[in-house]
Amino acid sequence: KHGPIEAWIIDDTSFPKKGRHSVGVARQYCGQLGKQDNCQVAVSLSLATHAASLPVFYRLYLPDDWAADRVCRRKAGVPEEITFQSKPEIALDQIRQAVAAGLPRGSVVMDVGYGNDTQLRAGVSQLGLSYLAGIQANTSVWAQGALPRPPKAWSGRGRPPKLIRRDEQHQP
């Protein structure tokens, strides 16, 4: 269907698998099955009009254990330069490629699996794109330019503090 691009959709698709010989197969969440099981997962970026969507980037996700297994990589012919990247890192790479290719822009739409990643949201903003992201209820989001107070100074005893602090002027 014709019409202007309204959104760039980041999502992943899982493919249930029996056995462990296909590239990237691991016990991980499989959306098709609604539970953890052996599957492959691909991260995609699709462009959407009001009536239709079309995937423009698609990349197989390699779980960390699989990406680090030299024997499996060699058997499958996975090039050395391919290293582990999280799903949000793959998504941000795809968005950067779409911007570099001059694809028609739209707001980036992502579910909580991607939207909860601060670096992804920040990267999308740095590219001058707006986004609509699902986030977990316990995630603090700060207005642009507003920052939390830093953790308390370390007293020299115990573990160094790492929790951010809030006060009247520092609120998410």
Walk through the language-model features, giving the residues of each:
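Active-site-proximal, Lys/Arg-enriched surface segment
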Residues: K1-D64, R74
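An internal, acidic/charged active-site-proximal segment
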Residues: R70-P172
